[in-house]
Amino acid sequence: MIRIGILGYGNLGRGIECAIKHTKDMKLVAVFTRRDPSSVKILTSEAKVDSVENILSYQDDIDVLVLCGGSATDLPVQTPEYAKYFNVIDSFDTHANIPEHFAKVDDAAKATGHFGLISVGWDPGMFSLNRVYANAILPNGADHTFWGKGVSQGHSDAIRRIEGVVDARQYTVPVESALEAVRSGKNPELTTRQKHTRECYVVAAEGADKAKIEEEIKTMPNYFADYDTTVHFITAEEMKKNHSKLPHGGFVIRSGKTGWEDENNHVIEYRLKLDSNPEFTGSVIIAYARAAYRMHNEGKIVAHTVFDVAPAYLLDMSADEIRAHLL
C-alpha cells in the first residue's frame, strides 16, 4: 500500500483526497495544514489532520508527499524544502519558471536520495506530454493551445482584489473561428486576442462604482488588457447558483505536413472537458504519485517531470496486464 501525505487542504487537496479513494493500492495517511488542525474537516475517517509544524515526524510513515500550495509563493519554497525529507510531487504551473524550480528540487532531492516530480497536472502535465508526442511525430508543423471554456482561478482572484468587488469568476473562452482555422490545418498565426476571450461575472458591493470596476478589469495589464473582455454584474445568489463549480478544459493541436513535397496535411488534437479542474488535476497527480513511488523503489532519485515517466508506471496493473488489455 502506497502511503500518501497531503500538504495543504484547499480545492486541490480535496481533489487529491477524492482521487485516492478511487485507488486500491494507496491510502491517505495525513493532511498537513498551516491552519488550526481542529478547524480542518477531511473526508477520510482513518487519516489524520496535523499541523505542518509536525510534518517531519512522519518521514517513516509517508511514501509520497503531495504538495498542494500555490505556484506563486508556496511551491518555490516548499517543494525544494520537503524534497530533503520526502519523495515529493507538485503541480507547479508557472511555465517560465519551471527550469529554475526543477534545478532547486533536483539539488535537494539529489543531496538526500529522494525522488521529486514537479509540474504534474494537465497544463503543465497532460498537455505537455501531448505536445512532445505530436512534435516527435510531426516535426514539420506548428503547435496551438487553447484553454477553456473554464474558470481561471488566478484571473478570478485578480478581479476580487479590485476595490468594490465582493466576488468574481472569470471564464477563459476559446474563439471558435480561431479553433476551426487551426483544425483545418491552415496553421494561422494568431494573436492573443484572436485566440481567446475573457468573460467575467462580478458581484459588486452595494454602492460600488460599477463603471470604474469594469474599466479596471478591462485595462488590467497581464490579465485582461490583451483580450476582448466582457463584464457581467450579477447578484451573490446568482453567483452561488450558476458559478460555484470550477470547470475547465482546453485543446492541444498540432498540424503538420508529410510527404516528399509536403503534400499531405495532418492534425493531432487532444481535448479535455472538465467539470472540476482540481479533481481532475488531483487524479493526474495521484497516478504520478504511484509512478514516483515505484521509480524510487527502483533506486531512482533527483527531480523529474512527466517527460521522464514511462506510462506503465502510472497504472495499478502488471506489465502483462497492460500488454493484454491496453496495447
Language model segments and positions:
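C-terminal substrate-binding/catalytic lobe of Rossmann-fold NAD(P)-dependent oxidoreductases
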Residues: 3, 14-15, 22-55, 151-289
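Glycine-rich Rossmann-fold phosphate-binding loop(s) that bind the pyrophosphate
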Residues: 9-10
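Rossmann-fold NAD(P) dinucleotide-binding segment
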Residues: 55-64, 72-91
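General beta-strand structural signal in soluble alpha/beta enzymes
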Residues: 90-91, 116-120, 146, 169-170
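Rossmann-fold NAD(P)-binding glycine/threonine-rich loop
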Residues: 92-116
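Oxidoreductase and adenylate-handling cofactor-binding alpha/beta cores
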Residues: 126-142, 157-167, 291
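NAD(P)-dependent Rossmann-like dehydrogenase/reductase catalytic/cofactor-binding core
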Residues: 262, 266-327
